[in-house]
């Protein structure tokens, strides 16, 4: 009889684990697919789209001078976009990456505490607006988060299993994730602190050291190449307390209000959750803190580079909620149920951090002996997460609007298709905004790219090589109207770019042309310039010369 009872308890526990892991993944899958086609890509997504559609030799050639840090992702997207080159397909890997991360966060909660903690943690991760944002981004960050969550789960298995093969699985997963984005290397510091808090034996440290060595060996060539391309992150600024505050708000299920403070309180309560706190707290705090600290010397910080650290927040909040539910169950013991989702050994969720104990069949068979608040507590937690999601619905709707991204190249292209006449010349200022025409070539099929000398795929560059300043000036002398797709900030400020060809573009349109039509989409402005009358052009040229001389003296 005892054997049959244990068998039934084990089967119920397995079913509870499956439910806890599957439900959050399905939830974020639905959220991610909702409004996935926004009707236009923004700049970074267009880079993914264009590079992914090149041949493998062309991608390899490009990576020698640009975006080596994203090389593995571009090769992956080359395979994906071969199925169908479209905006929805471009973003689908991120949707599935977010779903995988939610399931893996739930699996961590199940492994470290019990199924309902995993269910709550996975759901909290799924409904956090930041998760939904990057689930709909045609970039690598959602996949990176999935890789880090998988590596963290493999770390626990390696610690508990004590086999050499498990450490190679852990090191391999983390190495591949580092190739998706090199900032993942900071996870090694978080995992090292986790092992220290768990007080693991020397053999575990040796296994982890070998795995970390594998990660370093794989990552070193990428770091060396990316150092040569460090100018790509020259736009980043030194982060301050305001960026840290924004990150805290983004890592919680709601950025402000009652839900925010309740979530923070539960996370604080979760700090006493034993093994889970030893895993979640270093993951949540250490990578962002290290990157912000390094960025005080050399700016490298951006929120998306540490998106993977978000997984620690729902784990702590779910563990805190579990401890609160257990306390309520002790006050009203008659409400304690027998749902496997709510069962678990109290020593797993409430003990101080200590040595990791193997997680096996015996824990499942004896779990029903622990204190539980049962199905009612589990469903109450699920309902609370659902209410938090409802409160965040305005944020989700806003995030799915085309105007919420830095720009909408699709909208700019639609305006170009409507307004450009056959044979009209077009300038891109700076040249990287040629991405607009390359991403939506049909919209610019009537236009003449007056500055382009050699295409991007042929030259091994992203947006091609442009003609010389003198040749461009001669070409522009023969046109009476020219369209400009330019960076809004450059056009507003009038500051001369560093590149000579870019300076000629700006100088000629300011001296010899007048802006007539204007369409702005975030960072991108689409303008029509028509040639000034002769007398006006002479006055404008004189004024421009004086202005340029003044700038040179200053």
Where are these regions (language model features)?
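Intrinsically disordered, low-complexity regions enriched for glutamine and histidine
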Residues: 68, 82, 143, 179, ...
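Membrane-proximal helix-loop-helix interfaces that form the catalytic/acceptor-binding platform
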Residues: 2-6, 13-329, 377-534
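Serine-biased, low-complexity intrinsically disordered segments, primarily in secretory-pathway proteins
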Residues: 536, 541-550
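Membrane-interfacial, low-structure loops and terminal tails that flank and connect transmembrane helices
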Residues: 1-14, 327-372
């Amino acid at each position: 009889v005892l054997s049959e009872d244990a068998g039934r308890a084990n089967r119920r526990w397995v079913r509870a684990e499956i439910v806890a892991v599957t439900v959050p993944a399905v939830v974020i899958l639905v959220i991610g697919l909702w409004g996935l086609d926004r009707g236009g890509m923004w700049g970074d997504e267009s880079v993914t789209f264009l590079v992914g559609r090149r041949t493998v030799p062309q991608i390899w050639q490009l990576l020698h001078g640009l975006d080596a840090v994203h090389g593995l992702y571009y090769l992956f997207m080359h395979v994906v976009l071969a199925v169908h080159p479209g905006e929805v397909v471009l973003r689908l890997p991120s949707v599935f990456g977010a779903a995988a991360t939610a399931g893996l966060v739930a699996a961590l909660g199940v492994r470290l505490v019990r199924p309902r903690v995993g269910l709550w943690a996975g759901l909290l991760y799924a409904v956090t607006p930041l998760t939904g944002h990057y689930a709909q981004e045609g970039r690598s960050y959602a996949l990176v988060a999935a890789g880090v969550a998988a590596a963290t789960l493999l770390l626990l298995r390696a610690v508990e299993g004590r086999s050499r093969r498990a450490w190679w699985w852990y090191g391999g997963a983390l190495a591949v994730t580092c190739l998706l984005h090199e900032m993942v290397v900071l996870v090694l510091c978080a995992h090292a602190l986790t092992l220290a808090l768990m007080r693991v034996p020397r053999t575990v440290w040796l296994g982890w050291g070998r795995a970390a060595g594998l990660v370093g060996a794989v990552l070193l060539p990428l770091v060396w190449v990316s150092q040569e391309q460090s100018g790509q992150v020259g736009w980043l600024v030194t982060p301050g307390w305001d960026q840290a505050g924004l990150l805290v708000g983004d890592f919680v299920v709601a950025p402000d209000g009652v839900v925010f403070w309740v979530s923070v309180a539960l996370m604080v309560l979760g700090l006493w959750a034993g093994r889970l706190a030893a895993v979640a707290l270093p993951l949540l705090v250490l990578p962002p803190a290290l990157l912000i600290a390094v960025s005080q010397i050399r700016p490298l910080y951006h929120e998306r580079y540490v998106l993977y650290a978000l997984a620690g927040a729902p784990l702590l909040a779910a563990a805190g909620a579990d401890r609160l539910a257990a306390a309520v169950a002790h006050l009203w013991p008659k409400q304690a149920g027998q749902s496997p989702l709510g069962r678990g050994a109290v020593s797993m969720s409430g003990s101080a951090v200590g040595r990791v104990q193997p997680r096996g069949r015996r824990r499942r068979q004896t779990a029903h002996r622990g204190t539980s608040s049962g199905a009612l507590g589990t469903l109450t937690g699920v309902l609370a997460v659902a209410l938090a999601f409802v409160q965040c619905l305005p944020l989700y709707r806003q995030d799915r609007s085309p105007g919420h991204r830095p720009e909408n190249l699709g909208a700019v292209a639609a305006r170009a298709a409507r307004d450009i006449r056959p044979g009209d010349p077009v300038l891109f200022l700076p040249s990287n905004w040629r991405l607009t025409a390359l991403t939506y070539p049909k919209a610019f099929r009537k236009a003449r790219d007056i500055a382009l000398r050699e295409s991007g795929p042929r030259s091994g560059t992203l947006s091609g090589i442009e003609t010389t300043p003198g040749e461009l000036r001669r070409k522009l002398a023969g046109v009476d109207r020219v369209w400009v797709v330019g960076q809004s900030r450059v056009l507003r400020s009038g500051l001369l770019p560093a590149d000579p060809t870019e300076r000629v573009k700006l100088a000629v349109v300011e001296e010899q042309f007048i802006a007539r039509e204007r369409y702005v989409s975030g960072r991108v402005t689409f303008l029509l310039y028509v040639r000034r009358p002769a007398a006006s052009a002479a006055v404008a040229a004189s004024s421009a010369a004086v202005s340029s001389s003044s700038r040179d003296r200053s």
